[in-house]
């Protein structure tokens, strides 16, 4: 399958022929270190191997030019080569030299001012990223006249399961499996169903005014942009507004509307470890339990990775098309954040909320559960049993009850 998105990848700077050969020894040393690295560095390792390994033609050219005295086993400017290598590596993975990370005050000034922009978080902390998204949404001013202040946010989270604000987590996830596979559990500030994140999934959040908001709008734009670059992707939209490919769901969405503003945030499965996702959204509860809840229930769907687009390519393509499509007066800038520098008390407070057991386990909708073979009905609100056929269970935490259900029943 041809790769039509390669021009949109984040490319390292040009290195001349002589420097290519100078880097040969350096590269082969560094790739020994890279073998034990995370799989996400596979693409960059391959790219640099092609870049730094001279062909016979290159060596011949240099020799013909009177440079036959060059010894490929020695690097004349090792410090410069290491610096160049690191700079390119950091640029490619958005974690260094080329990315000017905003300070807390810069973030506040930019978010609270009118205007359109793109923000990419360089953090993989789901707590920071959801708190950052919440901060941008709450502090974006409503445009009283002229163009609305539409904004686009990207972030990639480490392993986590994210349930909707109005979901009963006990019906959505297997807590024991999440723990065994080192997945964090989060309850987000918006509605919608449960999704799984890892480093092969990109999250995007499109913010606009309430008047301009339409649930399927931005996903239609993404489909248009990506299909135009590579028609072999064959991306489409289902009736729920999810992006699909060959009948498989590759992107799930959730929405929030408040204060005259709205946002649509969604996942994009690019090269996620889907094997690790297996079973995480299948609660292992006794078969004798019958649930009644007013909360939102996730819709089960077959999922797959897009496969031929990397996270960096996706972010680069969508950012560039967003800049062109939504440009009004002047260029739309791209800013960068992380949890060490681009953080303030409001973001910290939101992170503390997201991390708290109170928010995770003791919020969400009211529900009741009937244990059929015991003739027992339990009613729960804010994580606490408030009504039951047995008085000794009233006032217990439902989490503790479920963890020790055999001793209670």
Curated annotation (Swiss-Prot):
Catalyzes both the ATP-dependent activation of exogenously supplied lipoate to lipoyl-AMP and the transfer of the activated lipoyl onto the lipoyl domains of lipoate-dependent enzymes. This is Putative lipoate-protein ligase A. In the transfer reaction, the free carboxyl group of lipoic acid is attached via an amide linkage to the epsilon-amino group of a specific lysine residue of lipoyl domains of lipoate-dependent enzymes. Residues 146-330 form the BPL/LPL catalytic domain. Its EC number is 6.3.1.20. SUPFAM superfamilies: Class II aaRS and biotin synthetases. Keywords: ATP-binding, Ligase, Nucleotide-binding. ATP binds at residues 188, 193-196, 249. Pathway: Protein modification; protein lipoylation via exogenous pathway; protein N(6)-(lipoyl)lysine from lipoate: step 1/2; Protein modification; protein lipoylation via exogenous pathway; protein N(6)-(lipoyl)lysine from lipoate: step 2/2. It is an enzyme of class 6 (ligase). It comes from Saccharomyces cerevisiae (strain ATCC 204508 / S288c) (Baker's yeast). GO terms for molecular function: ATP binding; lipoate-protein ligase activity; lipoyltransferase activity. The gene is AIM22.
């Amino acid at each position: 399958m041809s790769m039509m998105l390669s021009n949109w990848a984040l490319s390292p700077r040009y290195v001349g022929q002589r420097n290519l050969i100078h880097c040969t020894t350096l590269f082969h040393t560094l790739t020994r270190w890279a073998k034990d690295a995370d799989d996400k560095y596979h693409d960059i390792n391959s790219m640099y191997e092609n870049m730094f390994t001279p062909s016979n033609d290159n060596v011949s050219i240099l020799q013909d030019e009177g440079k036959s005295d060059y010894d490929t086993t020695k690097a004349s400017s090792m410090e410069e080569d290491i610096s160049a290598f690191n700079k390119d590596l950091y640029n490619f993975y958005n974690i260094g030299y080329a990315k000017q990370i905003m300070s807390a005050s810069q973030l506040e000034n930019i978010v609270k001012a009118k205007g359109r922009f793109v923000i990419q978080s360089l953090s993989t902390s789901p707590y920071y990223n959801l708190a950052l998204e919440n901060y941008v949404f709450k502090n974006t001013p409503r445009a009283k006249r002229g163009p609305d202040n539409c904004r686009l946010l990207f972030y990639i989270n480490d392993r986590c399961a994210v349930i909707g604000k109005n979901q009963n987590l006990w019906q959505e996830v297997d807590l024991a499996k999440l723990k065994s596979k080192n997945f964090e559990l989060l309850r987000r500030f918006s509605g919608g169903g449960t999704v799984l994140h890892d480093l092969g999934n990109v999250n995007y959040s499109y913010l606009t005014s309430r008047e301009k908001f339409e649930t399927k709008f931005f996903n239609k734009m993404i489909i248009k942009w990506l299909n135009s670059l590579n028609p072999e992707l064959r991306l489409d939209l289902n009736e729920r507004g999810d992006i699909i490919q060959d009948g498989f769901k590759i992107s799930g969405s959730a929405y929030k509307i408040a204060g005259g503003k709205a946002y649509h945030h969604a996942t994009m499965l690019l090269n996620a470890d889907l094997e690790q996702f297996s079973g995480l959204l299948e609660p292992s509860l006794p078969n004798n339990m019958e649930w009644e809840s007013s909360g939102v229930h996730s819709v089960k769907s077959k999922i797959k990775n897009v496969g031929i687009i990397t996270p960096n390519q996706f972010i680069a393509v969508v950012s560039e098309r967003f800049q062109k499509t939504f440009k009004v007066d002047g260029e739309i800038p791209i800013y960068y954040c992380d949890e060490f520098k681009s953080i303030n008390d409001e973001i910290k407070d939101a992170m503390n909320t997201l991390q708290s057991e109170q928010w995770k386990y003791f919020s969400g909708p009211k529900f009741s559960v009937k244990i059929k073979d015991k003739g027992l009905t339990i009613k729960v609100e804010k994580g606490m049993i408030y009504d039951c056929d047995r008085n000794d269970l009233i006032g217990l935490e439902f989490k503790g009850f479920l963890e020790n259900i055999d001793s209670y029943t």
